[in-house]
Amino acid sequence: MTADHHNTIQSQGLYVWQADNLLAATAALSGHWQPAQESQDSTELEVTSNRITTDTRTIQAGDIFLALSGDNFDGHDYINVAASKGAIAAIVSRPISTSIAQLVVDDTRLALGQLAAYRRQQHPNLTVIAITGSSGKTTCKEMLGSIFGRLAPTLITRGNLNNDLGVPMMLLELSDHHRYAVLELGANHIGEIAYTTEIVRPDVACILNIGTAHLGEFGSREGI
């Protein structure tokens, strides 16, 4: 979500992803290209895209599809669906038989974070405000987003994209016109805030409160 003065729009991301910077972003995860079926020459691989997405329902022509996997789903099962909708490449943890090039990495969930961190590093003039706490995050985010959005184009966390998947997804929406980012960081498990903070690298951190409503594996207020 982008607050652009009085207008709120979804950013499409203006940074260009290409074969070489995708490799650079995922180097720590052994990223390497598997060319499309009709071409076995990875040296001539051409990939140029403005957007990475994890949802085949929102695929647009020219997108790159990142195949996430969970307990009850496997994005690798939908790579050919993504290709049929115009995706030009896929980011996978195991190559499959498909008509598009695949960037093979050790872990696509971690690759999402690496790609988001790379995008953040591309934007050294961006001021990032990160907000966390047991309650009040969304209200504070909306207030600050409205304020900063009147000063300059501002990326604001959309919906509940505040976990270790949602935060990097939001950063992938950064484009070169953004000057501020107001990001909400949630914590469902130990280490999640440390992980998302490393990706976001905030200039300003807002810790609103520490309550006991959602202890989960933290066990106590002290654990949080």
Would you name each region that the model predicts?
Residues 111-223:
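Phosphate-binding loop of NTP-binding sites
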